Each structure stands twice: as structure tokens, then as C-alpha cells.
Amino acid sequence: MNIESQSSVSEKFSPFLTFTRKQWAELRKSVPLKLTEQDLKPLLGFNEELSLEEVSTIYLPLARLINYYIEENLRRQTVMNRFLGNTNANVPYIISIAGSVSVGKSTSARILQSLLSNWPENRKVDLITTDGFLYPLEKLKKENLLHKKGFPVSYDTPKLIKFLADVKSGKPNVSAPIYSHLTYDIIPDKFNKVDRPDILILEGLNVLQTGSRKAEQTFVSDFVDFSVYVDADEALLKEWYIRRFLKFRESAFTDPNSYFKDYAKLSKEEAVETAANIWNTINGLNLRQNILPTRERANLILRKGADHAVQEVKLRK
């Protein structure tokens, strides 16, 4: 069997359909882009560049696909309500966005929120990050888990699952804790309210995890209707993390209230060494042990290249 034949056989038995950037862009069809450069700027992450061309090429087709899934989901809910004789409101559609530190999950989530909010159906779209469900800094220190921050063990998973269950059940004004990247901690007594949205986007490192399922055990992924994994080679992720760390050293870290204010005093060489060490001992380790193994569970994978642009899209069949 030649290489070309092996490739076609591999694709045939893959659970994913693979699209080049050009092929995926064609699936936008005639959907108009209402987002402007001015609208895009506040959606971007720190030290991240993303063009309107990227939005129209990658995210518009994705928003179009998700809307088809939502419409089908609504039809199923109508059938279920008719069967049960219910007049309940529609159940919120939950989208999860997973991936490594520094891959650009937050930007992807905000862009998707903006596009879906402006779709003709005028749906209400809320966005919550799982950072708010990290254990407080004091607890992590007390239990010697600070070096595991971002790992599954550092999250109050039962609290996150209760939040998702309440949202799915249609409860009004469900509270989600707020995390501060400045203080590196949960903000006491401050919450985001999620009030029966049509769509909830949940963004975080480990939202696709299932672990070793025990009887009647519930996972975050059990509440998710459509999952996206933002992917890139680890070498790129590490490079982007170090670059972002250097930018923070000149900006956020200089704030006297910053948990990392001491890093602002580092020379560039010391900062690079520190960031690389953090990656090697924490973020990279978490990626390999906990995040990357969940990639194949996603409904859709966005694979980025060196310029942060998505080069390949994989859609579960």
C-alpha cells in the first residue's frame, strides 16, 4: 500500500472530517460579517492579533454550523415537550471551548459570543470562564496545590457541575464566581449572573475531561451540547506563553496589586527563564497530562499555526 492509499484509509476510518483553511472558509456561504474592526478590538486577548479575515474565514462558518445544531436541538426539545405534555421554556444550549494556556481560548469564546449574539434569531448568549471555579488561593496554599493550579484537582468541580445543572434546568440568575488575573484569586462576594440564556459558552482548560468514570459520576462534559478544542503544537504554545509573560512584565505585573508584581523587576533574560520554567513544570505538564488527551473528544478542533491563524479544522462526523 502506497503512502497516498494509507492516507485515504486513515481519513476514511477517522471520526473527523478534515478541512483546510480554504475548504472551511467556503462553508461560510453568503453569511454577512457584521463585525467591524472597532467591534473586534475589545474581543482580543492581551498581546493577541486577529484579523477580520480570520473571523470571516474561520469563525463565521463555525457560527453557521452551531446555529444549525441549535435549530435541530430546539426541534428535539419541541418533540420531547409534546411527548411529556410540558410547556417548559427551552433548555439553554451549552458550548464548551477547551485548550491549553496561551492558545487563545478566551478570544475564540468572545468572538463566537459576538457572532452568535448578532445572528438573525437574536439569541441571548452568555460567556463564563471556569477560572471562577478554581479554589481560592488560600485553600490552594493550605493544601499545597499552588503548583497544580489549572490542573483538575485545583477546581471546585462539584460547584461547577451544580452551576451547569442549574443553568440547564432553567433556573434564573444562577451565580458564577469571578476570578481576578491581577490578584490571582477569586474575588470575594462578586458574581456573574446567568439568567436563562439561549446559549451559554463555557471556556476553560479542562471542560472536556471525563477521567475514570465511576457509577453515577457526573462530569462537566455531560452538560455540553457542542465542544470546541483550540489546538497548536506545544512548541508554539510555549513560545506564545513566554511572549505574553514578557508583555505582562511591562504592564500588568507593574501594578502594585498584582500577585506577580515581583516579576516586573526581572531582567528580560530572567523573565524568559522564569516563564520557561513555569511552562515546563506547570502549564506544559498540565497540557500533556490533562488537556491534550481530551482533544479527540471535541466536536470540532481548530488547529493554529505559527501566526496564530487557524490552518486546519476537524469536524466530528
From Swiss-Prot:
InterPro entries: P-loop_NTPase, PanK, PRK/URK. It is an enzyme of class 2 (transferase). It comes from Mannheimia succiniciproducens (strain KCTC 0769BP / MBEL55E). Pathway: Cofactor biosynthesis; coenzyme A biosynthesis; CoA from (R)-pantothenate: step 1/5. CDD domains: PanK. Keywords: ATP-binding, Coenzyme A biosynthesis, Cytoplasm, Kinase, Nucleotide-binding, Transferase. Its EC number is 2.7.1.33. It is found in: Cytoplasm. GO terms for cellular component: cytoplasm. It catalyses: (R)-pantothenate + ATP = (R)-4'-phosphopantothenate + ADP + H(+). ATP binds at residues 99-106. Belongs to the prokaryotic pantothenate kinase family. Its main location: cytoplasm. GO terms for molecular function: ATP binding; pantothenate kinase activity. This is Pantothenate kinase. One of its GO terms (biological process) is coenzyme A biosynthetic process.
